[in-house]
Amino acid sequence: MKCSVLQMSRLSWTACVLLLPLLLLTLQGGVQGCFIRNCPRGGKRAVDSVQPTRQCMSCGPEGVGQCVGPSICCGLAIGCLMGTPEAEVCQKENESSAPCAVSGRHCGMDNTGNCVADGICCVEDACSFNSLCR
């Protein structure tokens, strides 16, 4: 049985239509990245049963702060340092495959953030003023 060019074209088109979504889903799972504790479902640390097992890295002058984002170092004695040389060490947190836990009282919408300095609450990769953190 011989296939005509038209039949081969339809067969190829059908295969592409069926395989393209599968390929896109596979690629999406492989390239999705995240930092410290803001990983979406499917991200590199997104295993639901895995809870943070270690404290986030120390940073700031004399290591008195903790990393709460890729360029954010916060501590009670120093407030929050964002994008400064003291906060650069926080980028190394991305190299770890294990999630870390940010210390501090829960705050923010639905208590998903942590008080990291006097009056400052950080949620995932954003920080804001919060009266509960005093």
From Swiss-Prot:
One of its GO terms (cellular component) is extracellular space. It is found in: Secreted. Its main location: secreted. Expressed by the venom duct. GO terms for molecular function: neurohypophyseal hormone activity. Residues 1-33 form the signal peptide. Residues 44-50 form a propeptide. It holds the Pfam family Hormone_5. Disulfide bonds join 34-39, 56-100, 59-73, 67-90, 74-80, 107-121, 115-133, 122-127. Keywords: Cleavage on pair of basic residues, Disulfide bond, Secreted, Signal. PANTHER family: ISOTOCIN, NEUROPHYSIN. The cysteine framework of the terepressin is C-C. Belongs to the vasopressin/oxytocin family. This is Terepressin/terephysin.
